[in-house]
Amino acid sequence: MKTFTAKPADIEKKWILIDAEGIVLGRLASIVATRLRGKHKATFTPHMDMGDNVIVINADKIQLTGNKRNKPNYWHTGYPGGIKSRTTGQILEGKFPERVVTQAVKRMLPGGPLSRQQMTNLRVYAGAEHPHEAQSPEVLDLASKNPKNTRS
């Protein structure tokens, strides 16, 4: 039996809508990363962008377990003495709360050029509105998949 390798013409990308309200961040990010890579498909090929286009709404209403909301996130500006930090709670209450979800998904993907290409298929919105109604995305309900996915 020959090994199957997908061709670019064989790849079918769907649009998936995920409502992040009440969903635990790490569980959301791991499912989104799997969908972006295309590992949920039987025709998965590791060196090709096979994943779906994923839309995440209500990113500002995600849940964090334990004391992670008060844990600082560090980054460096690139300038001398440019180490900065903010807690995850401060970022969620700030101007761009969707960055928490984006960074969690980005860090669950491998670090190569293909992962950067796959990250362009992720769209994260803080509110419930999104401009992708024309693509008629399929709704993926994470809350009903596993009771551990939600937090009250």
Swiss-Prot record:
Name the CDD domains for this protein: Ribosomal_L13
Q: Which GO terms describe its cellular component?
A: cytosolic large ribosomal subunit
- Which Gene Ontology MF annotations are present? mRNA binding; structural constituent of ribosome
PROSITE patterns the UniProt entry points to: RIBOSOMAL_L13 (PS00783)
InterPro entries on file: Ribosomal_uL13 (IPR005822), Ribosomal_uL13_bac-type (IPR005823), Ribosomal_uL13_CS (IPR023563), Ribosomal_uL13_sf (IPR036899)
Residues covered by region (Disordered): 130-152
Q: Which domain of life is it from?
A: Bacteria
Record flagged with keyword Signal: no
Q: Does the keyword Ribonucleoprotein apply?
A: yes
Q: Which GO terms describe its biological process?
A: negative regulation of translation; translation
Q: Which UniProt keywords apply?
A: Ribonucleoprotein, Ribosomal protein
The set of disulfide-linked cysteines is none
Quaternary structure per UniProt? Part of the 50S ribosomal subunit.
* Family membership noted in the UniProt record: Belongs to the universal ribosomal protein uL13 family.
- Report the protein's function: This protein is one of the early assembly proteins of the 50S ribosomal subunit, although it is not seen to bind rRNA by itself. It is important during the early stages of 50S assembly.
Q: What is the name of the protein in this document?
A: Large ribosomal subunit protein uL13
Q: Which organism is it from?
A: Dinoroseobacter shibae (strain DSM 16493 / NCIMB 14021 / DFL 12)
Ranked from the top, the taxonomy reads: Bacteria, Pseudomonadati, Pseudomonadota, Alphaproteobacteria, Rhodobacterales
